């Protein structure tokens, strides 16, 4: 089965909005063993829509069309589909009735323009939209079924999960055509990773892909075909073994996701004291539902005074070693852990830039500590001088990795090829 997607809308084509629907759809299909083989974006021009429907229907088996089902003049998907097939638009009585009922239930008078949403190509099969006014439908043209969905994300996602995916699986016996495993890496460049893995003899049907989204490089291991899918687990394990410490998570998008998964409902507690990361670690963890089950507190102790008064850092330590030092960050972590007797505490203090660096401690110098009930681990790293935002993101990632390694019973402090570490 050959699956394609056509995204519509001038705002998408012009880059005025990010097409999150397409990314979500492709990922969902991959999770179900189905690969999207082509994606096309078209503006709100009738002739362009007609042309792309006709052209792609000659090559694909099923096409998911997203957008253009609203009531306004620039919503042209139904009209374009009818024209592409050489048939008329007709009012779907069932959907027209549902539109009137919807507005009545909400105590509103239905604008005349909304009846447009009930006009479908003559041969169309209505596809239910249980949460909106845009009527979905599917039409057979040439070799392809074209499946039309609204652009509103929550309507689109529900229709795909409840209508499109079951239709595809039933009609095309789809599934288990492709599988994907992901390895998240930290502290090594994309080209270096590729050079390391180039010598591997991969089984037929297995290919590698790389995605850089700092501070991580994601290695994607694709398997196409039954035999390749069977070998996928062993190949992924071999890659992870080759790369060693740089692999920090399997099938996760970030280290904060990995830490959340490990700590959520685990009975383990965490406190965080942040200076240069400015609440980033806490914010990232709070972004996950359920983080209250393990996150005791997040303290942004930016000034020296707050480090002393809130965390109990010794003024003498600050005078002798400075805010960006192993000694200070260790006291920060110990103080944060002690407040609520947390199992663990992370602390960061550094120079994110663009100013504030010295010859001894240039921009990108960051001290990070992990306090446990049995002691404290710490390191001071020199990050590549990039943006202030990037220094904060890499610092957070290294802090998460220290905690991850402690949870795994591994060495907490390890070398990263792209991150220098100061000697203690």
From Swiss-Prot:
Signal peptide: none annotated. It comes from the Bacteria. Pfam families: CinA, MoCF_biosynth. HAMAP family: CinA_B. NCBIfam families: cinA_nterm, molyb_syn, PncC_domain. PANTHER family: NICOTINAMIDE-NUCLEOTIDE AMIDOHYDROLASE PNCC, NMN AMIDOHYDROLASE-LIKE PROTEIN YFAY. Belongs to the CinA family. This is CinA-like protein. It comes from Shewanella amazonensis (strain ATCC BAA-1098 / SB2B).
């Amino acid at each position: 089965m050959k699956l394609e997607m056509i995204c519509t809308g001038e705002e998408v084509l012009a880059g005025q909005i990010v097409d999150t629907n397409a990314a979500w759809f492709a990922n969902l299909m991959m999770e179900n063993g189905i690969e999207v083989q082509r994606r096309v974006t078209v503006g709100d021009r009738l002739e362009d829509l007609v042309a792309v429907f006709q052209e792609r229907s000659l090559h694909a088996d099923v096409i998911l069309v997203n957008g253009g089902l609203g009531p306004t003049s620039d919503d042209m998907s139904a009209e374009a589909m009818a024209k592409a097939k050489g048939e008329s638009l007709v009012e779907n009585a069932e959907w027209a009735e549902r539109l009137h009922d919807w507005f009545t239930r909400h105590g509103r008078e239905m604008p005349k323009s909304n009846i447009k949403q009930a006009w479908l190509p003559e041969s169309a099969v209505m596809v239910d939209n249980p949460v909106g006014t845009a009527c979905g439908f599917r039409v057979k043209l040439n070799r392809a079924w074209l499946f039309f969905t609204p652009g509103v994300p929550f309507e689109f996602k529900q229709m795909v999960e409840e209508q499109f995916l079951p239709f595809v699986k039933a009609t095309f016996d789809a599934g288990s055509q492709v599988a994907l495993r992901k390895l998240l890496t930290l502290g090594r460049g994309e080209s270096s990773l590729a050079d390391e893995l180039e010598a591997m003899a991969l089984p037929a049907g297995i290919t590698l892909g790389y995605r850089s989204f700092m501070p991580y490089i994601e290695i994607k291991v694709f398997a196409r075909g039954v035999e390749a899918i069977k070998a996928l687990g062993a190949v992924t394990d071999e890659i992870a073994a080759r790369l060693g410490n740089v692999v920090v998570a399997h099938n996760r998008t970030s280290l904060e996701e990995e830490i959340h998964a490990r700590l959520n409902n685990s009975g383990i507690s965490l406190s965080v004291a942040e200076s240069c990361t400015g609440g980033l670690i806490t914010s990232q963890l709070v972004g996950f539902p359920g983080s209250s089950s393990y996150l005791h507190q997040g303290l942004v102790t930016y000034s020296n005074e707050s480090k002393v008064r809130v965390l109990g850092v010794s003024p003498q330590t600050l005078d002798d070693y400075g805010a960006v030092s192993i000694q200070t960050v260790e006291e920060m972590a110990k103080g944060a852990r002690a407040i609520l007797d947390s199992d663990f505490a992370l602390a960061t203090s550094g120079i994110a830039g663009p100013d504030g660096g010295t010859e001894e401690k240039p921009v990108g110098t960051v001290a990070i500590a992990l306090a446990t009930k049995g002691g404290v681990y710490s390191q001071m790293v020199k990050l590549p001088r990039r943006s202030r935002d990037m220094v904060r993101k890499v610092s957070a990632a290294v802090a998460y990795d220290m905690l991850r390694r402690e949870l795994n019973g591994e060495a907490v402090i390890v070398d990263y090829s792209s991150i220098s570490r100061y000697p203690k």
